[in-house]
Every structure is written in C-alpha cells, then in structure tokens.
Amino acid sequence: MNKAYATEIVNTWKYENEYAIYDYSNEAEHMLDEEAWGSGIFTILNQDGELVGELSIEFFDEEEEYTPYAEFDNREITNQRELWIGFGMRPDLIGQGRGAEFVMACAQYAIEHFQYSGEYVGLGVAVFNQRAIKAYEKAGFQVFERTVGTINGKEFECVHMRKKVRE
C-alpha cells in the first residue's frame, strides 16, 4: 500500500445501497495509516498492475486481543494467534463471480507473507451480505459464530467464519 493507492481507495471506492457501509471514506484513518502499509494493509493489483482490491490482516489471541503491527514480524507471537483477513474489491468488479477466487488468493498471500503456521484463517461479515457469505463458503470458509458487530458506528448481526488451513 502507498499514499496514492490508499487515497484512491478512500476517495473513489463507493458501494451501492446497503453495501455503502463498506465505503472506504468511513475507513480513511485506517487506510491512510502509513505504519500499517506493508504490515497490516496491502494493495491487490491485477496482472496489468491495476488496483483491484485491498487486503487487511490482523492477528488475535484467545481473548480476542488485537496484535499491534509492530509485533507482526515476530513469528513466535503471530503463530500463537489466529490470522484474520479483511478485504475489499474495487466496486466495479463486484458481482462478476470472482469473489471466491479473490478471497482464496488473499488468504494464501496472508499465510505465505507471514509464514503463518496456525490452524485457521478467520474473517467476519455482516449477515445481510449474503453475496459475500456465498463467496466465502465457495472459498472453504464456514460459519462458526454469530455475533453483533459494529461497522462504521452501526450495529449489525454478523457471522465469524473460518477456514482450516493446517491439520
């Protein structure tokens, strides 16, 4: 991630209807956090070098405490925690049947980049976002928990999903 990509995402990626809660203008502080670039936030480019998505990576311990970016290089710490991914696809690419492939590529990159040897990769999604849930299920993720989450200050029923990546 760099300033040009982060600024483009924040200023121009707008989603329609109920998906507007995912607009990156609501995530400007996070996306423009230079400390996170290359450690917790990554750009996704296609073969032609065009920006097509973003990937956010986090690690959580059993108490669901977040691991600071400064500790991401410490394999001893990260491999004792669960890897969680979040991502966004450029709005004009959504709804074209590419979601499962996109999610699998994001998960694989996160695993390889951090040399993650944990058992699961997790993610969270609002229940109303059935389009995303179907893509995640196609990518091998399964619901393991229902919860209430907050997205841009609004509460939503959410599901946590995970995919087993190691035996």
Predicted regions and their residues:
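Conserved beta-strand segments that form the floor/walls of ligand-binding pockets within enzyme
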Residues: 84, 88, 122-124, 160
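Solvent-exposed beta-strand sheet faces enriched in polar/charged residues
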Residues: 58, 122-124, 144
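Conserved acetyl-CoA-binding loop-helix of GNAT-fold acetyltransferases
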Residues: 89, 95-110, 134, 138
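Conserved beta-strand-loop-alpha-helix junction that forms the acyl-donor binding cleft
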Residues: 117-133, 149-155, 162
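Acetyl-CoA-dependent GNAT
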Residues: 3-4, 11-94, 109-116, 164-166
